[in-house]
Amino acid sequence: MNEKKERIIKTSIRLFAKKGFAATTIQEIASECGISKGAFYLHFKSKEALLLSACEYYIGMSMNKMKNIEEDLAGKPPKEVLKKQIGAQFEDFRDHKDFIVLLLTENIIPENQEIKQYFYKVTMETDKLYRNALLVSYGEGIERYVADLSIMARGIVHSYMNVMVFNGELNIDAEEISAFIIERLDDLVQGLSRSALNPIVSKDIFNPMPAGKDQLLEDIQKVKENSTLPEDITVSLDVIEEELTQDKPRKPIIKGMLSNLAGTNDKEVERLRALILSLSQFDHKKSSL
């Protein structure tokens, strides 16, 4: 990443944390960076694109640090590795507090499918990292409860970070809190080993994210090419396809076209309709479509 792009990301995160994502304008970011608004658009096509790049920058850095710890401490006791990984998260909190504050205090994920998919992917990767670390640390005996234990471990870490956000005077040492959390995980594992209750969460809680816009556009093209469809269905698919290519698809139009597709006897059309509805930005429960 070039120096100017990195400066824009760091400046924007500081402004987002201070003013809020919605209230911060591109002009303010550009002015704070000492560049023109046009120069901003040379690096990012929108504020949402900037946010996605910022998430990839900071979260990617943190995930790489966690993986590097695992590699660097290969051969060390597994719980020591896990302790270092937990401590690294609190070090990241200290070093990149503005970004963590933004994540914890504001709903920063706008109606942008790329950002939602990115966060879903990161959540799956973090859960996988924790599950593997917990299994190696505590053995196969916890496998039945490993999904619940991963949720509890991540919940403890995030809860302490929340406390640190809302109490700015609280200064917690990363090594001290990571050792404390490992002891609490020991307690949880001991309790689970005696439990006769069924796990709350299944191992496969994270299903693949619904198809994104690019995949849907490809699927629409295939259906139009390979099916003999009535004209009204083809026109409706054309309109949906056109809307999906826009940065901000118009929901009322897509809603109307989805109504046109309802009740067809074509399995591929029905599958497409279900996929479009599965996109959270078009989910009727979330966006009144």
From Swiss-Prot:
SUPFAM superfamilies: Homeodomain-like (SSF46689). Disulfide bonds: none annotated. It comes from the Bacteria. Signal peptide: none annotated. Residues 2-62 form the HTH tetR-type domain. InterPro entries: DNA-bd_HTH_TetR-type_CS, Homeodomain-like_sf, HTH-type_Tx_Regulator, HTH_TetR. GO terms for molecular function: DNA binding; DNA-binding transcription factor activity. Keywords: DNA-binding, Repressor, Transcription, Transcription regulation. The keyword DNA-binding applies. Gene3D superfamilies: Tetracycline Repressor, domain 2 (1.10.357.10). Residues 25-44 bind DNA. This is Uncharacterized HTH-type transcriptional regulator YerO.
